[in-house]
């Protein structure tokens, strides 16, 4: 029998200000990878993390 997948999945977090802000320190979009528990957090994740392109802490949202 095949084993079922675990509850934890790998997600990607992307900076929300990098796309709309043309005056950045460097070109590009900040992305982080992390895991989340599918049972406990069913909605999309939003975490404040440091963006090296904007050079400040910004909100990073989960992307598909």
Swiss-Prot record:
Note the SUPFAM superfamilies from the entry.
Answer: Zn-binding ribosomal proteins (SSF57829)
- Please provide one cellular component term from the Gene Ontology annotations of this protein: cytoplasm
Q: Which UniProt keywords apply?
A: Ribonucleoprotein, Ribosomal protein
Q: Which InterPro entries match?
A: Ribosomal_bL33, Ribosomal_bL33_CS, Ribosomal_bL33_sf, Ribosomal_zn-bd
In its UniProt record, a GO molecular function of this protein is: structural constituent of ribosome
Q: What GO terms in the biological process aspect are recorded for it?
A: translation
According to its UniProt record, which protein family does this protein belong to? Belongs to the bacterial ribosomal protein bL33 family.
Q: Which NCBIfam families match?
A: PRK00504.1, PRK00595.1, rpmG_bact
| Protein name, per record | Large ribosomal subunit protein bL33A
Please name the source species: Synechococcus sp. (strain CC9605)
